[in-house]
Amino acid sequence: MIPTPVLRFNPIADKVPKWKRIYHKWRGIQNMPFKSKYFVGYDLDGNSYWEFKNVNNPGRYRRIVEPAKPDLSLVDHKIPPQWVQWLRFTRPHHPTLEELIADKQRQELLQAKIAAYEAKWKEIPLKTAENADESRDMSLEDQLKPTFTEAELAEMAQVFEKVPQQAAPAPPRVPNMAAIEVEDIIKHYPENGPDTVLADGGRQRDHDLKMDYVEKERDDSGKPAEWTPKAAVRRRG
């Protein structure tokens, strides 16, 4: 971590004139009732940051930046991220020049380390066909092939044999109506059949109806029923 430097010189002396700095210092005094705009601070490029009262919300000030060179477009001005956080009210206190200088030194040190590492990697000679690794000469298919010995393969085979294999689920059994006995089909015959409504001699007739039911079940087994539309019922209105 880079320590916060102690300023022994003014880093913005060549960017902001002295009379303007005195004027901004006076504008930074906030205990004067007739002022509506207050100076807050500078960045290392000389841009000034201000606060002024919000007419729509008196309890919250508005924050703006005034570029040091108004002739340039706002896109050409590089605002430090610390001041961007302050402008967006994600930072309670504004950054100081010491903090900005410390962050600039950190970036310069990081760039110097990156340049040193890049120079170090450039000194390492590239691998040629003579000193290349064996893995580089192998194709991708050969590199992806597993390299197991015969003993390892035999051990894995024994492990797989000990693992219980789950049997495949049996398909749903569809009853074959032709192979079902007549008594089994008659069990499903409706109980409220002709036995309950017929008189003498109805038992033989009931048996005939049951046999017709058996033949019908055998013929219609597994066949979808045909759709027979019903006549619409006319409503009386």
Swiss-Prot record:
Keywords: Chaperone, Mitochondrion. It comes from Yarrowia lipolytica (strain CLIB 122 / E 150). The keyword Chaperone applies. InterPro entries: ComplexI_NDUFA12 (IPR052618), NDUFA12 (IPR007763). It comes from the Eukaryota. Residues 214-237 are annotated as: Disordered. One of its GO terms (biological process) is mitochondrial respiratory chain complex I assembly. It is found in: Mitochondrion. Belongs to the complex I NDUFA12 subunit family. Residues 214-223 have a biased composition (Basic and acidic residues). Its main location: mitochondrion. This is NADH-ubiquinone oxidoreductase assembly factor N7BML. GO terms for cellular component: mitochondrion; respiratory chain complex I. Acts as an assembly factor of mitochondrial complex I.
